[in-house]
């Protein structure tokens, strides 16, 4: 705002008429042209213009002053509306000055309108000049306040610009933190899915192990029952055999006593037999002598024989006699030692295939295989081209709308050509075994943002949906009403 200096004159300058020497140029309020016809530096004989023309010029000057004040107020209000608020003290001082200026101008206008035409016009002009001098001081003070207000507003504007820059930087950092948090949340979700699958697999293994332990417990119970029965039977057999052994010991002791007694009897009978044999030999000799004597007497005693010679040698053993009749059966003998095992018998026929047993425990990790051949060089990825995938708006982590993360933003997948092969790849990326059902036409609600993938065509063997054939990133002819979705299988 341009502040023009106002050159005002005091009451002592009335005589020289200096206030009428320069025309009123619309900028200086102190040098008023009270004539109606432009520059009036030529004074009339009466010392001034006519009263009617001077009054008209004064009214025009007051109206111009009113218009100037109005424009100043309009500018102040525009600045107040377009800029941030200033301090309350400056606004209160500015409001008081404007109100005082309005009241002074209103009083001046009323005095001018009510003043009689016959009054001394020169006195009225000097009074107006004094009033304008006072108003000029007020306007100068008001201009200073406006300048200070404008400086304060510019300072606030600079602070607001700095604040906007800081807010933009904060929004960028917040967006980066949000993207990082979303990526970490996705990774945690994938790890959670894998952990759930591992827990379910371990639960299945534990169930199988529990069943096997139960079957083994039943078998152990059967074996224990069989062992108890065998123990009972063996105890009975051992007791029976002990009884038999005791009886056998009694029989053996009796047999030993009988044997000793029979040996004594045999010895006695042997002595008797020896005595009988000796007696029999004597008798035999006597009989032989008697027989010889008789034979000599009966024959013609022509030859005389001498006495018998000594006893001859024992003759040859006679022929073996016939076997006698079998005797009575004796008691059962002790069991003999166990014989050698016999030869193995012929192989029997194959039996029927039994039921499949429970799944065994996981084996040890095998040896590392040979190093494979070097693959072809892949395409170079971008610095920020880190792609991920998630399921949104489903009843659980196993189902929902398919969204991929590309270029630091999440986007959806169009259902053009969407089938179970594509869904199977997506589910295996998320750690599930496979896909149960695929959906089209935004079954889980319409997404927002970009549609990153369209015309997806997977073979079903890919490890990632980004290895499948599809149109370029963000190139699509679909809307969010065609967002694809899946439901993965949960064991």
Curated annotation (Swiss-Prot):
PROSITE patterns noted in UniProt: SRCR_1, SRCR_2
Compositionally biased residues, Low complexity: 323-334
Major localization listed first in the record, in broad terms: membrane
Pfam families per the UniProt record, alphabetical: Collagen, SRCR
Keywords for this protein: Cell membrane, Coiled coil, Disulfide bond, Glycoprotein, Ion transport, Iron, Iron transport, Membrane, Receptor, Signal-anchor, Transmembrane, Transmembrane helix, Transport
Cellular component per GO, a single term: endocytic vesicle membrane
Membrane topology (Cytoplasmic): 1-60
Domain Collagen-like, first and last residues per copy: 305-356
Disulfide partners: 414-478, 427-488, 458-468
Entry coiled-coil feature ranges: 91-111
UniProt function note: Ferritin receptor that mediates non-transferrin-dependent delivery of iron. Mediates cellular uptake of ferritin-bound iron by stimulating ferritin endocytosis from the cell surface with consequent iron delivery within the cell. Delivery of iron to cells by ferritin is required for the development of specific cell types, suggesting the existence of cell type-specific mechanisms of iron traffic in organogenesis, which alternatively utilize transferrin or non-transferrin iron delivery pathways. Ferritin mediates iron uptake in capsule cells of the developing kidney.
Protein name: Scavenger receptor class A member 5
Species of origin: Mus musculus (Mouse)
Organismal lineage: Eukaryota, Metazoa, Chordata, Craniata, Vertebrata
